[in-house]
């Protein structure tokens, strides 16, 4: 056998594992599952044994995770609201996002990161609110400590983010750890980046005690920031995501383009370029942009030129109720009238050969 053919056969097993698609986070479907914990644990498709075990042992945590799915999917949709792919979910699909995440793309990287972050956030918040039997406020934040402003006492309820991260890692990563392929490694990396993003915005809040509000004594606690901060941070990481390829031994990544830096644990990584999401494509999981609202005056991703992929747009005149003629009344209220406002709404045309024009 000649040398080129030898090289092909050496790389074939790695290539096959690299291209094997699998959307593994079927726990996302917990948002749509109701009933008792046993019903939920037994009916969410695709959970591995470790995940079902945790589900049965910690039904209260699973409820928190299920409620959190709606929160992080809403955040995903907010971040992608001006993007051709707008993080749309499919109600009857256990993968929640359909075939679009079969591709190891930037979008997949973001969804795995934001979902992992969402689990940390939901569990940690539930701990602080006393909703979980297995955790409460951070037990390590006790006694006296110092910061740049001086001495303070730990008090209140510090968010127990270490517990949230630990449980999220055990539950979310369980299925990926059973896999040895490149996609599993990619998902694990992005899951970790999502968890780290939540902790990045943990902030110290304090309350002053003393005469006339003087700060002779301070009580402080650690609190998570609003989840929007995590979402916006991961959105920036999405825009700077690093394309990688597998090492020859299949144990890690190297950058696809040697001009770029090696990804850190905070970066998002992906293997495959994204489709353009312009047209409906069942194989790619793209719903296209036909019927999407676009911004005629924008020069960004939401512009009619970019959003509609050069196909043009339709314009319709609509009316909406707005507040007008607002006046300040002493003291202390602003009173407005309800007025009808007419405005033009621009929506992307469908491809000429398309049979589907429903908005996405």
Swiss-Prot record:
One of its GO terms (biological process) is cardiac epithelial to mesenchymal transition. A lipid is attached at residue 212 (O-palmitoleoyl serine). It is found in: Secreted, Extracellular space, Extracellular matrix; Secreted. CDD domains: Wnt_Wnt2 (cd19345). Keywords: Developmental protein, Disulfide bond, Extracellular matrix, Glycoprotein, Lipoprotein, Secreted, Signal, Wnt signaling pathway. The keyword Signal applies. PROSITE patterns: WNT1 (PS00246). Disulfide bonds join 76-87, 127-135, 137-157, 206-220, 208-215, 278-309, 294-304, 308-348, 324-339, 326-336, 331-332. Residues 1-25 form the signal peptide. Glycans are attached at residue 295. One of its GO terms (cellular component) is cytoplasm. Palmitoleoylation is required for efficient binding to frizzled receptors. Depalmitoleoylation leads to Wnt signaling pathway inhibition. PANTHER family: PROTEIN WNT-2 (PTHR12027:SF86), WNT RELATED (PTHR12027). Belongs to the Wnt family. Ligand for members of the frizzled family of seven transmembrane receptors. Functions in the canonical Wnt signaling pathway that results in activation of transcription factors of the TCF/LEF family. Functions as a upstream regulator of FGF10 expression. Plays an important role in embryonic lung development. May contribute to embryonic brain development by regulating the proliferation of dopaminergic precursors and neurons. This is Protein Wnt-2. It comes from Otolemur garnettii (Small-eared galago). The lineage of its organism: Eukaryota, Metazoa, Chordata, Craniata, Vertebrata. The gene is WNT2.
């Amino acid at each position: 056998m000649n040398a080129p053919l030898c090289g092909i056969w050496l790389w074939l097993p790695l290539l096959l594992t690299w291209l094997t698609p699998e959307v593994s986070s079927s726990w996302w479907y917990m948002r749509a599952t109701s009933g008792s914990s046993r019903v939920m644990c037994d009916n969410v498709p695709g959970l591995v044994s470790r995940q079902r075990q945790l589900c049965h042992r910690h039904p209260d945590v699973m409820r928190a995770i299920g409620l959190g799915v709606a929160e992080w999917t809403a955040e995903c949709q907010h971040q992608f609201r001006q993007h051709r792919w707008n993080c749309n979910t499919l109600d009857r699909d256990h993968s929640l996002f359909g075939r679009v995440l079969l591709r190891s793309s930037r979008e997949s990287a973001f969804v795995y990161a934001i979902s992992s972050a969402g689990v940390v956030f939901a569990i940690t918040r539930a701990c602080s609110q006393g909703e979980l039997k297995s955790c409460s406020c951070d037990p390590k934040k006790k006694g006296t400590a110092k910061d740049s402003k001086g001495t303070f006492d730990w008090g209140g309820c510090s968010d127990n983010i270490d517990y949230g991260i630990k449980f999220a890692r055990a539950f979310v990563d369980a299925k990926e750890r059973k896999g040895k392929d490149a996609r599993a490694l990619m998902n694990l990396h992005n899951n970790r980046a999502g968890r780290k993003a939540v902790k990045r915005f943990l902030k110290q809040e304090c309350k002053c005690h003393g005469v006339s509000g003087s700060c002779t004594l301070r009580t402080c606690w650690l609190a998570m920031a609003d989840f929007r901060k995590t979402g916006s941070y991961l959105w920036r990481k999405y825009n700077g995501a690093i394309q990688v390829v597998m090492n020859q031994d299949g144990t890690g990544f190297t950058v696809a383009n040697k001009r770029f830096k090696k990804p850190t644990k905070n970066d998002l990584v992906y293997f495959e370029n994204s489709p353009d999401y312009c047209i409906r494509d069942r194989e790619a999981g793209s719903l296209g942009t036909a019927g999407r609202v676009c911004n005629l005056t924008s020069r960004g991703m939401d512009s009619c030129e970019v959003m509609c992929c050069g196909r043009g747009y339709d314009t319709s005149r609509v009316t909406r109720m707005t507040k007008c003629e607002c006046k300040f009344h002493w003291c202390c209220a602003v009173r407005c009238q309800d007025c009808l406002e007419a405005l033009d709404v621009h929506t992307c045309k469908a491809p000429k050969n398309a049979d589907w024009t429903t908005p996405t």
